[in-house]
């Protein structure tokens, strides 16, 4: 426990976010490639997407303030101290795309279950 506290104190927010996003991506890839259930694969894809979103947020993190121009702050100081807004816009776009993909994947999984009476991908692939 002492070692974990030491690492947390020595690590900054951006590095912790990169490590967490890497772990989420690894967990998501493991679920996509090695899990047999279709619903669990969908959950793994969502975890993978969350890891990518967290990595994008960590890339845009600047350690400064939120990207809102306050009165009395020069443009140079504002640009130097604010977070990078493009990565945040990409994450918002990615969340919308992931939500629509989730709806389609769940719809396809319902159709697969009605046709094959199972959600195990090995059984579904053998029957085709």
UniProtKB/Swiss-Prot annotation:
Q: Which domain of life is it from?
A: Archaea
GO biological process terms, semicolon-separated: sodium ion transmembrane transport
Enumerate the subcellular locations listed in this protein's record, separating them with semicolons: Cell membrane
Q: Which residues cross the membrane?
A: 13-35, 42-64, 90-112
Q: Which controlled-vocabulary keywords does the entry list?
A: Cell membrane, Membrane, Transmembrane, Transmembrane helix
Gene Ontology CC annotations of this record: plasma membrane
> What is the recorded membrane topology of this protein?
Multi-pass membrane protein
Any one Gene Ontology MF annotation carried by this entry is: sodium:proton antiporter activity
Tell me where it mainly resides.
Answer: membrane
Q: Which NCBIfam families match?
A: PRK07375.1-3
The name under which this protein is listed is: Uncharacterized protein MJ1310
Native source organism of the sequence: Methanocaldococcus jannaschii (strain ATCC 43067 / DSM 2661 / JAL-1 / JCM 10045 / NBRC 100440)
């Amino acid at each position: 426990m002492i070692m974990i506290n030491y690492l947390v104190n020595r690590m900054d927010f951006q590095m912790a976010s990169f490590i967490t996003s890497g772990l989420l991506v690894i967990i998501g890839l493991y679920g996509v490639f090695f899990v047999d259930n279709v619903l669990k694969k969908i959950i793994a894809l969502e975890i993978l997407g969350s890891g990518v979103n967290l990595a994008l947020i960590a890339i845009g993190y600047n350690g400064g303030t939120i990207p809102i121009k306050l009165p009395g702050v020069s443009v140079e100081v504002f640009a130097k101290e604010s977070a990078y807004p493009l990565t945040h816009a990409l994450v918002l776009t990615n969340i919308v795309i992931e939500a629509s993909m989730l709806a389609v994947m769940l719809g396809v999984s319902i159709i697969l279950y009605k046709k094959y009476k199972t959600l195990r991908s090995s059984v579904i692939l053998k029957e085709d």
